[in-house]
């Protein structure tokens, strides 16, 4: 039995939730998100409270209800407040520059990397070594940040590469003679 599924979701002021069948739409000041909920889950929207309950006769219904509750909560937080991930570029000559819908990265390769920013994501570069990924969809923000990081993951000897701002890179000692 899922403890997460049992907790109701409170809808903040300024956020509008509509349910049509198994499709839930959340509108807020930052945008609009739509998601189809699993058939094993029954969603009820009453005034400013959303509850997720499992349907009878489905084996993993409680797990699906917990997942649906977490996804709906992420949609509400995203449309109300938004999500952001901060990346740092560590290394000599590593730079980032946001130009319209592309992010130009200089990461020590023989060529610059041009990253196409997906729809629904905004990228800012407060400095040449910092990248801010912002958006409404939590999954898309995290995936975009992971895609940027994948170009040059932090290496364990000098710590050079693209890392999350809160990431601790485990350092290794150099080989001794």
Curated annotation (Swiss-Prot):
Upper classification of the source organism reads: Bacteria, Pseudomonadati, Pseudomonadota, Gammaproteobacteria, Alteromonadales
The similarity comment for this entry is: Belongs to the universal ribosomal protein uL6 family.
State whether keyword Ribonucleoprotein applies: yes
> Mind telling me which InterPro entries this protein's record contains?
Ribosomal_uL6-like (IPR000702), Ribosomal_uL6-like_a/b-dom_sf (IPR036789), Ribosomal_uL6_a/b-dom (IPR020040), Ribosomal_uL6_bac-type (IPR019906), Ribosomal_uL6_CS (IPR002358)
Share what the entry says about its subunit structure, partners included: Part of the 50S ribosomal subunit.
Which residue stretches does the UniProt record annotate as biased composition, category Basic and acidic residues?
157-171
NCBIfam families for this protein: L6_bact
Q: Which domain of life is it from?
A: Bacteria
What's this protein's function? This protein binds to the 23S rRNA, and is important in its secondary structure. It is located near the subunit interface in the base of the L7/L12 stalk, and near the tRNA binding site of the peptidyltransferase center.
* Any GO molecular function: structural constituent of ribosome
The region called Disordered is annotated at 157-177
Keywords on this record?
A: Ribonucleoprotein, Ribosomal protein, RNA-binding, rRNA-binding
Query: What Pfam family is a match, any one?
Result: Ribosomal_L6
- One cellular-component annotation, GO: cytosolic large ribosomal subunit
Source organism of the structure: Pseudoalteromonas translucida (strain TAC 125)
The Gene Ontology biological process annotation of the record reads: cytoplasmic translation
What's the protein called, per UniProt?
Large ribosomal subunit protein uL6
């Amino acid at each position: 039995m899922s403890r997460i599924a049992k907790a109701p979701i409170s809808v903040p002021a300024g956020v509008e939730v509509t349910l049509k069948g198994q499709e839930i739409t959340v509108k807020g000041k930052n945008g609009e998100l739509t998601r189809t909920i699993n058939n094993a889950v029954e969603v009820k929207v009453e005034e400013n409270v959303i509850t997720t309950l499992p349907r009878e006769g489905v084996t993993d219904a409680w797990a699906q209800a917990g997942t649906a509750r977490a996804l709906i909560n992420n949609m509400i937080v995203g449309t109300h407040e938004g999500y952001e991930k901060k990346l740092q570029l560590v290394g000599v000559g590593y730079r980032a520059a946001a130009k319209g819908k592309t992010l130009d990265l200089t990461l020590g390769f023989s060529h610059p990397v041009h990253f196409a920013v997906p729809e629904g994501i905004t990228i800012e570069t407060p400095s040449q070594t910092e990248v801010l990924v912002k958006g409404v969809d939590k999954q898309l923000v995290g995936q975009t940040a992971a895609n940027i990081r994948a170009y040059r993951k932090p290496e364990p000897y000098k710590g050079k590469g693209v890392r999350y701002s809160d990431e601790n890179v485990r350092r290794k000692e150099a080989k001794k003679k």
